[in-house]
């Protein structure tokens, strides 16, 4: 039976490249001269530290533009609260979402079932597998999910016949 998997993955090498480009741009920009702004990346998080909210927002804008240029969806970013740090600084932690959560998996599952197409979908850890007898039905599901805004970036992989 034909099937495909729905996943939500982010290329961490591209994230690393985008963060490094952002660091370089901050070092060169005139409005950041003499400011104490820094970005650090650890596994699935990016920590932003700056002197005030204005500069923090500017760093986020730069980071988002670099993500977009590198082909990473900004839907994969989950922004934490802006916190006060020591020395009058402000901090924000951005988490990079990998995989599809159980709640999002159920939501996608319901969207697929509402179509009344002859396909089955199963939640498998952080991905969904969709199977059906007809390839056209599977392609219709892909088009439907591409058109919906589910809050996560979806990739369709492992298409088998």
UniProtKB/Swiss-Prot annotation:
Cysteines paired by S-S bonds: none
InterPro entries, per database record: DUF520, UPF0234-like_C, UPF0234_N, YajQ-like_sf
One GO CC term, this protein: cytosol
Residue stretches in coiled coil: none
Nucleotide-binding as UniProt keyword: yes
SUPFAM superfamilies attached to this UniProt entry: YajQ-like
GO MF annotations, alphabetized: nucleotide binding
Keywords for this protein: Nucleotide-binding
Keyword Calcium on entry: no
Domain of life: Bacteria
Protein family per UniProt: Belongs to the YajQ family.
Role description: Nucleotide-binding protein.
PANTHER family linked to this entry: UPF0234 PROTEIN YAJQ (PTHR30476:SF0)
Name of this protein: Nucleotide-binding protein Gura_0717
Natural source organism: Geotalea uraniireducens (strain Rf4) (Geobacter uraniireducens)
């Amino acid at each position: 039976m034909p099937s495909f998997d729905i996943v939500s993955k982010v290329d961490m090498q591209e994230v690393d490249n985008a963060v490094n480009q952002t660091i370089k741009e901050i070092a060169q920009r005139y409005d950041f001269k003499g400011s104490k702004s820094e970005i650090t990346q650890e596994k699935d998080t990016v920590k932003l530290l700056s002197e005030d909210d204005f500069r923090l927002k500017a760093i986020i804008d730069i980071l988002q533009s670099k993500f977009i240029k590198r082909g990473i969806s900004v839907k994969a970013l989950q922004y934490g609260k802006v916190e006060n740090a020591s020395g009058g600084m402000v901090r924000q932690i951005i988490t990079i979402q990998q995989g599809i959560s159980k709640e999002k998996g159920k939501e996608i599952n319901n969207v697929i079932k509402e179509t009344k197409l002859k396909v089955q979908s199963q939640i498998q850890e952080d991905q969904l597998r969709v199977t059906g007898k007809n390839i056209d039905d599977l392609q219709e599901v892909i088009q439907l999910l591409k058109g919906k805004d589910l809050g996560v970036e979806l990739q369709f992989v492992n298409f088998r016949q």
